[in-house]
Amino acid sequence: MISKETIEKILQFRNDRDWEQFHNSKDLSLALSVEASELLELFLWKGNEDVSSERLKEELGDVLMYAILLAEKHQLNLDEVIQEKLTQNNQKYPVQKARGNATKYDKL
């Protein structure tokens, strides 16, 4: 779980640099996508075991921080966002149909 203290540190890092002025929804979303692509690039042409844990942590950290900044921009509670999404996923992927099956929900 990401603590309130950690989220506050992320926001303080941003505020100390006066970067909030650049953090509009579009640019935060684009930055999140860029960082997610950098995460994907770690796996490009490699097996799972060939990926550096340190690089994985670095890129995953970037993705998570931009997600937190975007949620904060829209005053979203991340715990609520995740709980709501889990509820939706439980409805889309009932255990009896989805267990051991990677098929998308609309094809189950």
What are these regions (language model features)?
Residues M1-L60, L64-L108:
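Flexible "arm" and connector segments at domain edges
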